[in-house]
């Protein structure tokens, strides 16, 4: 996502909690990070990275990380009038809390979690689920249109996170269904590559079938989205459902499967590692 912004001409100042990621961004953008005039500036810490920012983008793993970075000095370091675009997937409550705190300091905030996997991030074809004031969303739109090809404003702050929870419920069910289906077809001795091609053209067609079925059949799980992070997202979805007195039995079942895989050491693999469960 950062590399696409850099290619599009946005001047970037980067900070990542994992050292060296600035070099990865420069390489993905086709730049020589040591010599290119438009290579990203690298902040020694998060506060340095945002000191002159008109827009600050976050993409962190969870609520704890987002609050640690924001409340660890970033809020105070941001220039008055700056806009925070939060691509992280976190609870709606944390998004609303941050928006309120930032507003008190003359700052704006939108939640903008994304879906589309690593493939979509690299291609700039993510779907961006946005919550925030219309003026703030309009201000962010030129940037959002670089990282995604579908930008959907869903309501006030927190609405983007709620929509992302809905998305992750669908991901849970679809990935688990594809894993089950691949296991059944394989046990029946069917020519599964041909079966998958046939099913893609019918009512069972889905993103998970299109992009993950073959990997499941080959028992390889190159990282698109970490299983452990998806489990974190399911916790958000289950919490949201509980708040509105709704039971999600399919999601709860997939969460239990993911718990068992994480306990077995597979949390850093792609969500498609759900297929491992059916080989146990």
Task: Show where each model-derived region lies.
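Interdomain hinge/lid region at the active-site interface
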Residues: 161, 205-271, 278-280
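Active-site-proximal catalytic alpha-helix in oxidoreductases
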Residues: 123-124, 128-131, 156-188, 199-211, ...
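Hydrophobic residues within alpha-helices
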Residues: 1-5, 98, 143, 184
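Rossmann-fold dinucleotide-binding core
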Residues: 89-169
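Residues in the short beta-alpha loop(s) of Rossmann-like NAD(P)-binding domains
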Residues: 17-18, 62, 133
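Rossmann-fold NAD(P) dinucleotide-binding segment
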Residues: 46-109
């Amino acid at each position: 996502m950062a590399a696409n912004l850099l290619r599009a001409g946005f001047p970037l100042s980067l900070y990542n909690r994992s050292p060296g990621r600035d070099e990865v961004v420069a390489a993905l953008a086709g730049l020589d990070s040591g010599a290119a005039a438009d290579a990203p500036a690298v902040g020694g810490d998060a506060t340095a990275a945002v000191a002159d920012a008109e827009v600050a983008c976050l993409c962190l793993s969870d609520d704890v990380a987002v609050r640690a970075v924001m409340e660890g000095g970033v809020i105070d370091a941001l220039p008055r009038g700056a806009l925070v675009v939060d691509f992280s997937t976190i609870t709606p409550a944390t998004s609303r809390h941050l928006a309120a705190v930032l507003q008190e300091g003359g700052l704006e905030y939108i939640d903008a979690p994304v879906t589309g996997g690593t493939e979509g991030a690299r291609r700039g074809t993510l779907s961006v689920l946005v919550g925030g004031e219309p003026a703030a969303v309009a201000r962010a739109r030129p940037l959002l249109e670089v990282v995604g090809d579908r930008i959907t404003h869903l309501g006030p702050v927190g609405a983007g996170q709620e929509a992302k929870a809905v998305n992750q419920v669908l991901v849970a069910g679809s990935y688990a269904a594809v894993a089950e289906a691949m296991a059944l077809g394989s046990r029946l001795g069917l020519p599964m590559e041909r079966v998958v091609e046939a099913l893609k053209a019918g009512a069972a067609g889905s993103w998970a079938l299109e992009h993950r079925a073959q990997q499941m059949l080959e028992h390889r799980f190159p990282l698109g989205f970490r299983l452990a992070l998806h489990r974190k997202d399911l916790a958000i979805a289950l919490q949201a459902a509980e708040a509105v007195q709704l039971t999600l039995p399919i999601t709860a079942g997939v969460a239990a499967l993911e718990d068992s895989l994480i306990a077995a050491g597979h949390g850093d693999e792609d969500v498609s590692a759900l297929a491992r469960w059916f080989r146990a």
